[in-house]
Curated annotation (Swiss-Prot):
GO cellular component, one term: cytoplasm
Taxonomic source organism: Burkholderia cenocepacia (strain ATCC BAA-245 / DSM 16553 / LMG 16656 / NCTC 13227 / J2315 / CF5610) (Burkholderia cepacia (strain J2315))
Cleaved signal peptide residues: none
Catalytic activity: N-terminal L-glutamyl-[protein] + L-leucyl-tRNA(Leu) = N-terminal L-leucyl-L-glutamyl-[protein] + tRNA(Leu) + H(+); N-terminal L-aspartyl-[protein] + L-leucyl-tRNA(Leu) = N-terminal L-leucyl-L-aspartyl-[protein] + tRNA(Leu) + H(+)
Record protein name field: Aspartate/glutamate leucyltransferase
UniProt record similarity statement: Belongs to the R-transferase family. Bpt subfamily.
Pfam families hit by this protein: ATE_C, ATE_N
SUPFAM superfamilies: Acyl-CoA N-acyltransferases (Nat)
Principal place of residence: cytoplasm
Length: 276
C-alpha cells in the first residue's frame, strides 16, 4: 500500500487512507480494481464507521474500504430510505411466502451449522471463485470479526415436533449504524430453488430498521453492468452516492460516465479529497 492521506477532521482525523495496489476486479470481468482503505482498524468504532459508510465505505471483517479504481466509477453505494419504501407486488408476495421463517438475532458467533451452509452456498453460487474453499478461519475473519455494533441473524423453519430446531434456511450479518442498518453478507440454502431468500432478507431488514427508528438500509454497491447486482435496483426508492452526494437513483436513467471514463474522486467525510 502507498501514499497515506490524513483526514483533518475530528474524530476522523486519527484515520489514514491508503490506496491498494491494483488487483483483478471481482465484479466486472477483465477489469482492474483498487480500493481505498481506512486505517487503523482499531480506531473505527460504530460512530466513525457510520460516517465512513455515508461516504461510500464498506467493511470485510475489520478491513474498511471503498472502490478507488483508475478510470472506473461503476460501483455506486446505494441505500433504501425505509420511510418511503414502496414494495412491489412481487416483493409483497415474497414477504408473505416467507413470513413463517423464524428470525433469531444474536451477537456474532461461530456455529458449525452456519459454516456448513456457507460452504454449500459458495460451492453452488460461486464455484471456482476462491470463497468455495474458505477454511473456518477465513470464514470467521470475513464474517465474524467486527469492532462495531454487528449482529448475526439466522432464519429457520418453525420448530419441528418434539422441539427440534427447524431447518436452517438463511444466515445474514448486519451492522447497526447511527442512521440505519448495513447489510454485510447473506447466504442461504442453495438447494431451495426460486425462493428469493435474498429479497426477503432485505425486506426483513427494512422492517427492522423501521422498528428501530433508523431511516436507512445500506445495501452496499450497485453495479449497472453486473447481473449479480441487479436485484438491488428492485427496491424503490433507491438512493445512490454520486459525486459525493446521496440522491434518488433511477437505475434505468442514472447519469454515470461509462466504465472507461476518467474517475472523479469522491470526497472523504468532511469534504476532503483523497489521493492514491
Amino acid at each position: 500500500m502507498t501514499h497515506p492521506t490524513e483526514l483533518p477532521l475530528s474524530p476522523l482525523s486519527a484515520l489514514q487512507f491508503y490506496a491498494t495496489a491494483p488487483y483483478p476486479c471481482s465484479y466486472l470481468d477483465g477489469r482492474i480494481a483498487r480500493s481505498q482503505v481506512a486505517t487503523p482498524s482499531h480506531l473505527i468504532n460504530s460512530d466513525i464507521y457510520t460516517e465512513l459508510v455515508k461516504a461510500g465505505f464498506r467493511r470485510s471483517g475489520v478491513f474498511t474500504y471503498r472502490p478507488y479504481c483508475d478510470g472506473c466509477r461503476a460501483c455506486v453505494p446505494v441505500r433504501v430510505p425505509v420511510g418511503e419504501f414502496a414494495p412491489t407486488r412481487t416483493q409483497r408476495r415474497m414477504w408473505k411466502r416467507h413470513r413463517a421463517l423464524v428470525a433469531t438475532v444474536s451477537p456474532l458467533h461461530y456455529d458449525e451449522e452456519h459454516y456448513a451452509l456457507y460452504m454449500r452456498y459458495q460451492s453452488a453460487r460461486h464455484a471456482g471463485g476462491g470463497m468455495d474453499r474458505d477454511s473456518r478461519d477465513q470464514y470467521e475473519q470475513f464474517l465474524l470479526q467486527s469492532r462495531i455494533n454487528s449482529r448475526l441473524v439466522e432464519f429457520r423453519d418453525l420448530d419441528a415436533p418434539g422441539g427440534e430446531p427447524g431447518k436452517l434456511r438463511m444466515v445474514s450479518m448486519i451492522d447497526i449504524l447511527g442512521d440505519g442498518l448495513s447489510s454485510v453478507y447473506t447466504f442461504f440454502e442453495p438447494d431451495d430453488r426460486h425462493t428469493s431468500y435474498g429479497t426477503y432478507n432485505i425486506l426483513w431488514q427494512i422492517e427492522q430498521a423501521k422498528s428501530l427508528g433508523l431511516p436507512y438500509v445500506y445495501l452496499g454497491y450497485w453495479i449497472r453492468e453486473s447481473p449479480k447486482m441487479a436485484y438491488k435496483a428492485n427496491f424503490h426508492p433507491l438512493e445512490g452516492l454520486i459525486d459525493g452526494r446521496w440522491k434518488t437513483l433511477d437505475p434505468e436513467r442514472v447519469d454515470l460516465p461509462p466504465v472507461d471514463a476518467a474517475l472523479a474522486r469522491a470526497p472523504l467525510p468532511g469534504g476532503h479529497s483523497g489521493s492514491g
